Amino acid sequence: MTAGADNQALPRDAARAIAGAFAPARPWGNRWDYCYTLAKLRSDPLYPGVLDALRGSNAPVLDMGCGLGLLAHALRHDGQSMPYRGVDNDAAKIARAGKVAARAGLAASSFEVMDLGTQLPVHRGSVAILDVLQYLNAEAQQALLRNAAAMLEGDGRLVMRMALADSSRRGRISRIGDRAANLIGWMQFRPRHYPDAESLRALLQQCGLQVSLRPLYGNTPFNNWLLVAHRS
């Protein structure tokens, strides 16, 4: 990983190139997904951070809670060609993700509907869990993380971005934002539990992983952090 590489959102040209895959096929088509992905890429340092964390590994990536599959497009734009598999409980998003990926000709990429609260895929390689953890209760979070740790193989990495539990202004804004995402229908569930940094670190270290954790909120108002873990 390159220190400091994840402090800013993607440059304008890169963001437009990636978001372009989500533009409607016809001028009068629905531009919601295009506008959302472009705004996300231009404002959020998530993808530079995740791309940097995965760079240098050829391990297949499982993206748990993949949404529209934006990570797959960002990986390919970055020149990372490892197999990608995205799972999410939102069938509508998965349908759109698969359609856009096929239209864009994304190689070695697949998508499927899966509720991570009740089912886990079989996988060996790297695991990405991005802005998902808070939608599971504490017990389900612990089970998911133990299973994700067991999936790491070779030079595979566990890469997570999540809002952490604290009493900061950023923490309060994160909770409000997550509730709003549920109210407008973008997220199917309300947040259930925000983890704290030390509990996450302790659990993953018990699983035999080396853990790094640092802020990843850039210029956004949210209390987002990036966790990267790998086998010792």
State the predicted function of each range.
Residues 2-59, 68-120, 139-140, 159-232:
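Class I (Rossmann-like) S-adenosyl-L-methionine-dependent methyltransferase catalytic domain
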Residues 131-132:
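Short catalytic micro-motifs in class I SAM-dependent methyltransferases
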Residues 128:
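A conserved beta-strand element that flanks and buttresses the S-adenosyl-L-methionine
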Residues 64:
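Conserved beta-strand/loop positions that form the S-adenosyl-L-methionine
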Residues 142-154:
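A short glycine-rich, Lys/Arg-flanked "PGG" loop and its adjoining helix->strand segment in the class I
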